Amino acid sequence: MPKILNALLCKFPYLELFTNLTKMRYTKVKSILSLFFVLLLPVFLRAQSNNSSSGSNLNKLQQQFVDLRFGMFIHFNMPTYWNADWPDPEASPALFNPKKLNADQWAKAAKSANMTYGCLTTKHHSGFCIWDTKSTDYSVMNSPYKKDVVKQFADAFRANGLKVMLYYSILDTHHKIRPNQIEPEDIEMIKTQLTELLTKYGKIEALIIDGWDAPWSRISYDDVSFQDIYNLIKKLQPECLVMDLNGAKYPGDGLYYTDIKTYEMGAGQRMAKDVKRMPTLACLPINSAWFWKEDFPTVPVREPQKIVNELIKPLNEASCNFILNVAPNRDGLIDDNALASLKEVGKLWKNEGPTTKLSPLEDPIIASNIAINAPANSSWSDDMNIMDFANDDDYHSSWQSNPRVKEPWFEIDFKKDRSFNTIVVFESKANISKYKLQYWDGAAWKQIFSGDNAERVKLHRFDRVWGSKVRIQIEGSKENPSIAEFQVFDERR
């Protein structure tokens, strides 16, 4: 009984009632403890079960995803009818009318290239939904076409032995889901739409999310809680991988807010060769843009030889799944030049099955970083790289210790007690090798970690603690120590 009650207190630190129990008579204490045990045990066990089911199973799903090697991205939505990837958000649904749409043609084109899956843009940044949604009138059901495109896609790809993935944009300019003006009803719309997509179309292998915590969308993981959305997806489909297209911001050797690292190669994003290998997705269009343009039928597409030798093969060797975008035209069909290129790719490249086995990975960070812009202190800093650079949410700036300091330290001061259970120390390059992590409990510094860790991304997960300060004391480094981001999280586990 005491062990379980202690665990409950760690899991639910807000139960301050227990602090007063010692003042009561033994029989009353025993009665109250028994009542709490009965009421909270199912919640505790469920939380423990959810936590224990993630780690090794997620690693298995990550490996399976990388082993798929090659798939088809299908950008097909309102931009198809505008000759622009970002159309007018007030564009009329009357424009969307793919009279000859044939999802079976898409699937067979993917098969001809030896692809293993497809991923369709269910909603892009302008907010038009191409499934039968109850969340808005701005959908395919109010267009002249009036048919559920997502259903046709899912049915056709499964019928051809291909796996099904979906793309969804958090940024929604039609419904004004934009930075600095997101209301609770906007978040409910997002949850409703994701629930529809994950309950109406069978097993979804992965969900690619876009327009979230990107420099151009500026919707943060606090504006729309990543942890809430991630947990909703896992509740609806526990084996659905969550991929946020955030590779431009976060370090390549850490899983931040995604189950799979992602890189949009057309935006200049590339995997670093000198960091720890991660399960990865890279994407690029076969044409010059993501959505169909009027010149696509007559402009040459990517050469099959280059697709195979410069993209599929080297990316697969780096534990990276490559997804090639092939945009259907306004009739809902893939153009002949793209079909021919895909068929040639299939002649040049065969899927040889599993890739190199990945090393086991920690679960991704999904909670908000409570250290961002909190008051920071440190030992003597380099004049141009002060302590505030280590928690500014900018991975390209760093706090740097003054070289004269023999025992450098860095500290976050929350000014009040906060609960947390995860700390990440990120360096621009691996340098710090030995250190201590401690927190202030109001009376003394308590130790979280003391030892060696030469990784560039130093991830520490531990039982939840309460403290008003947290610090690192650096005891060993190859050169003058610096920290790009000192991060603190309170994860739900």
Show which residues each predicted segment covers.
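Bacterial Sec-dependent N-terminal signal peptides
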Residues: M1-S49
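Extracellular carbohydrate recognition
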Residues: S477-I483
